[in-house]
Amino acid sequence: MAIQALLVILAVLLVLLFLGVPISYAIAVSSLTAILSSIDLNVAVLTAAQRTFVGMSKFSLTAIPFFILAGNIMNQGGIAKRLVDFVMAILGKLPGALLVTNIGTNALFGAISGSASAAAAAVGSMIRDGADEQGYDPAVTAATNAASSCSGLLIPPSNALITYSLASGGTSVAALFMAGYIPGIIWALCCCVVGVLLAVKLGYKGTPGKFDWKNLGVCTLRALPSLSLIIVVIGGIIGGVFSATEGSAIAVVYALVLAFCYRSINLKSLWKIIVDSAKMSGMVVFLVGVSNILGWVMAFLQIPDAVAALLLGLTNNKYIILLIMNVILLVSGTFMDVTPAILIFTPLFLPICQSFGMSTIQFGLILVYNLCIGNITPPVGNALFVGIKVGRTSLSKVMPYMLMYYVAIIAGLLLVTFIPAVSTALPQAMGLM
């Protein structure tokens, strides 16, 4: 019965998404369709409305709109050029200087803006012209830009990790933020390895001359105000000075002060940023509320228990189960955005992982890492197609190089999946778990 209900949910969800129905409505309709055989329609609709309201009224949810607003302000604040110069001053002597600079800057910019697509667009456009002048293959630079754009979604502050905290029933945001650093750095390092190998093969050199400490100092001072946002907000949250919600509000104030000091926005552009952020936040908040319906339906019909029994019926080896889950998440992430996928798969797979002793922290990083790979994979792959557009190239030319990045990034996923310390060492060291 439970497996049949799950198949109904997935089938209805896929059909509605194929027809172009917004993901929030598709989740609600598919969930209600699955439960109508068990309870009365009026009761189902009333309960669904209550669950949606409860999901949207969580105080901790306000952190997401604030971080979205702070990210959009910073995105318009002209910080990309400062970060590119800062990373170039550090990594510029490596082979393929512009490739590794792109990777390092994407990690920093993605963490600040909270958007892989924004990182791919802002940083990629900064790197593109210089890469063209130095004879870099546009397909190589586009692939590097796209592949590295999602590393910032793992490095805090991360809306994806906040969403997972809500979906998992209140996992510590501070612990998740601390846990995100090593997986995010692993992603960036995997990309750097591929980038350097490509640079050596294709003959892309580093910047000539000796390491310039003076230039590094100048670039650090110019980038420090932007980097301080991460230090102040994350340091305050992890140190217990303020909560994630309070930290998100502080991030907005900090971003506003910085943007006005840089004179990169005015009142007119600020209003547009606020409106755009409100639209984006409205979609996310409503999606979180609607996902409560799905969680209720799964719990009512005991779907997680049935899925666990099904997987354990195939094998009792937890490593094989984790591999199966990774494959499911990787495939799902290719056609589903990160936020709805987190809300759908957390109630489905988290109980299974907890049954063999995995922490909610580790599962959260496995989940987000998988879905970030989907964000750079066709057919949807938002960050991938932004990178291709910015790079002025085509999917067919980029994919051979993307395959190399996929191999390296998935190797990083296996580290996150099978070595708990990758996700838990820092939170444990900081006394957060």
Where in the sequence are the language-model features?
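Alpha-helical transmembrane segments of multi-pass membrane transport proteins
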Residues: 1-433
